[in-house]
Each structure stands twice: as structure tokens, then as C-alpha cells.
Amino acid sequence: MQKLQTVNAETLLYEPLEKPSFVVDSLIPTGLSLFCGSQKIGKSWLMLKLCLCVSQGLPLWDMPTMEGDVLYLCLEDTFCRIQDRLFRLTNEASRRLHFAVASCKLSDGLIVQLEDYLKDYPNSRLIVIDTLQKVRTASKDNAYASDYGDISLIKDFADRHSLAVIVVHHIRKQNDSDVFNKVSGTTGLTGSADATFVLEKEKRASDTAKLYVTGRDTPYQEFTLRFRDCSWELVERKTQEQLAKEMIPDVLFRLVDFMRDKEEWAGTATELLAAMRETETIPTVITKWLNEYRTTFLNENHIVYQYSRKKHGRQISLAKRAGDSGDGGDSDIGIPPVTVIDA
């Protein structure tokens, strides 16, 4: 039996360790990624664009790529169809991009085939398997165990060779506020992946789609893409920080402006809205938002929020942090909230 390999905390704290690398900067890490979307949405077009970029060291949507050999297993296509796509996408292709339209299943030799490929092309950076279902075999095992077992074989291979492997998969036709819950199969798939991508259109006939990205080392991002001339082009990219900022109610931005020339303010929620000349927000909602964003947005803007119950109603206190005079100071010293004296 193999002995457990352990590392003590002191070593982890002080020894420089190699950080995960990205084949596409801040988007596609080394390891296993799931790329999911409905049938005929254009997943293969996007995968081919990605493969072309990495094989030539060209940026993908202004994001640098790590140049190297690329293997694209187009297991639902023919070489003729791949050639037609290349005609439409590029005038110049690299000898570093390799295609195959058939392979073994995971259960009968795919990993061995990939190992042999790497012996011939040791500078490979990316392998795309399109699709997962084409390399799986029917199993009577528990669905979660089957999903986890299959995807773990691919992940172990990717980790062992420090390269990126993208597995193309489908999503279910269902409504869910979390797009990642639409990935076909069990959480054994998404739970094993280092990153998960979901490409989704609001309407099937639309030429625009959203690409949702999440992962262990990949920050949550949303991309708006447009399919034009057989190529997915970037319209807009939003980071997790930008998306979080968009969730902040507009009235709180106006509250920051309201407090810009004040050191403190106190009163009821109704009085606050009247002072700000706000007519579209009700008192209970502004109170909820003040509490929800007090440690994030308000704190970032150096505003201290306090709430108390008085004989004549609920009172709100707003104050600038000590040392913040509106000139962008960054003091962390708080000041006591304004005391409201009941008549």
C-alpha cells in the first residue's frame, strides 16, 4: 500500500509553490474544463476558434494565450466538415493544430491514446474532447459515481501533464436561475471540473449568446458574444466585481452623493427619502438595502450606518468615518453614530 504524502503547514506557508497556469489568460486554466451548451448553438465553432488561437499564440478576445500544440477530437464530425469550418474561419492555419474524428472510449483505451499522442507532441497545451458522450460507455453504476469516475479519469490525465483539457457537453432544457444547474448529468461532472463554461442563448434564432464561467482558479465572469461570419466575437466582458456593482441599487449611489457634503445625518427612513427627494423607493426597502450593503458598498464609500428603535419610530444614523472629509481618505477609525434625542 502506498504511503500518504503529506505537507506540513509551515512548508505551505513559506515555500513558494507554482500557481495554476492558464492556456487563455484568466479564462481557461490547466486542468479539466467542462464546456456546455445546447445542441447546435455553436459550441464546435467556438472550440475551433480557441484551438486556432492557442496553436498560433494569438489572443482570444484580447486575452493572451499560451502557444503550443493542440489536439481537437471532433468525434461528431468528419474531416470534410472540419475543412469547411477552417475555410470559413481562417486563411492561415498552424501545423501545431491536430484533428481526429475517432478515438477509443474512456473504458477501453482513450487515456492510453492521449498519452501516446503526448509522446509525439510533448509541447501540447490544449486538448478538446467533443463530445463527452462519444467517449463514454453505458453504465449500470450509480449515475453520480459514473459521472465522477469518467470525468476524474480525464482530470487526472490533465493534472499529470499540466495541460488544459476541455470536454464539450450538453445542457438540459429546463428553467433554473443558476445556469450551471442546467449541465446535463449529475453534480459529479461539475464537481470534478476545475472550470465550467455554459454557453446559452435567450432565443434560439438570436445571433448573441451569454458565456458564463466559473471555476476553482477562474473568477466568475460573464461574456456577451455575437456569432458573426461563423465566428464568436466578443461584445462585452463582465467580471465578478463589475457584476456585483451592477446589483447595487441606484438609490445607494445617490445616497453617497447626498452624504458627500455632510459629516452626519439622522432621522427616519421616510425623512431620508424626503431629504434625498426620492419618490420611487419606499422606506422599508431603503432600510433593507442600507443594512444589506453596510459592510460592502457603504463601507467602501466611508459611510457608517446605524439603526435603532426609538419611542417615536425606527431611526437611521449615517456618518462619515473619522478622517474621511470627502477627499478620498482611507481611515478605518469609526465615529459614534449620531444620537437622536426624542422630543
Which residue ranges define each predicted feature?
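Conserved RecA-like P-loop NTPase ATPase core
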Residues: I28, C51, Y72, D130, ...
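Hydrophobic positions on the alpha1 helix immediately C-terminal to the Walker A/P-loop
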Residues: L46, L50
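Conserved inter-motif catalytic segment of the P-loop NTP-binding fold
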Residues: Q2-L4, E10, L17-K19, V23-V24, ...
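Phosphate-binding/switch region of NTP-binding enzymes
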Residues: L34-C36, K40, S44-W45, L73, ...
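Short, conserved catalytic or adaptor-binding loops enriched in Gly and charged residues
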Residues: F87-R96, T186-T190, F297-L298
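DNA transaction DNA-binding modules
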Residues: L225-A343
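Gly/Ala-rich phosphate-binding loop of Rossmann-like dinucleotide-binding domains
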Residues: S55
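Pre-Walker A (Motif I) flank of P-loop NTPase domains
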Residues: P29-S33, G68-D69
